[in-house]
Structure formats: C-alpha cells, structure tokens
Amino acid sequence: MSTTDWNTLLPALPALPAQTRIALHAPTAQALLRARGNFKNLTAAQPEAEVWIIANAQAVQAVVDAPEAMEAALPRVLLCPNTLKNNGLSAPANVQVLPMGAVEALARMQADGWIYIRS
C-alpha cells in the first residue's frame, strides 16, 4: 500500500484571494446538511470569504421545516422562490429568498466570478 505525497499531488497551492466568493448549491436535504458543514469549515478556514448557501428543490422544504438546524449558516441561506411557489410554501421570517430562481442566480453568480460548489 503506497502513501500519497500531497506535496506532489497539490504543489504549492496559492491561498484563496481575499475577495473569494463561494456559492454552495444544495438541491436536496442531504446536500443541505453537507452545505451546512461546508459553510462551517470554509468560514473557519477563510473568515474573509463570502459564502452563501443556495437552496432549491427538496432542500427548501428542509429549511422551511427546521430553519434552526442551519445554525450559524442561517443568515447566509438563500431560498429559491420557484420552489417555494411551486410547493405552496412560505419562507420562515428569518430566511432570505432569492429575487430569481436558484438556477438563474447560480448562473449569474458564476458569471460574476463566484466559485460554485455542489454540496
């Protein structure tokens, strides 16, 4: 069994730029749980990075059902208005809703230089 030499595999990776902006896409309840962990880890490692969780599809229902489960990430969660409308849901008072569908928002964010991560 061989060991991986991470210095060879990932040679001298530069630090993330100070203006790093990351969009964590969560389309399922399981992805939402991963996004919460990703958010926690990213903001601990890169406190100056701007990190948002974009929830659509089944992840929206998970946020609506238990917003408190998002813990510290809750102020950085954005819900898809299309999913809310199509499922007859309302966003909790303390949760933000995107001004457009999640897919369009993610496309625009990527075009504007955001890093996309599917959680």
Report residues per predicted region.
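Secreted/extracellular ectodomain signature
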Residues: M1-S119
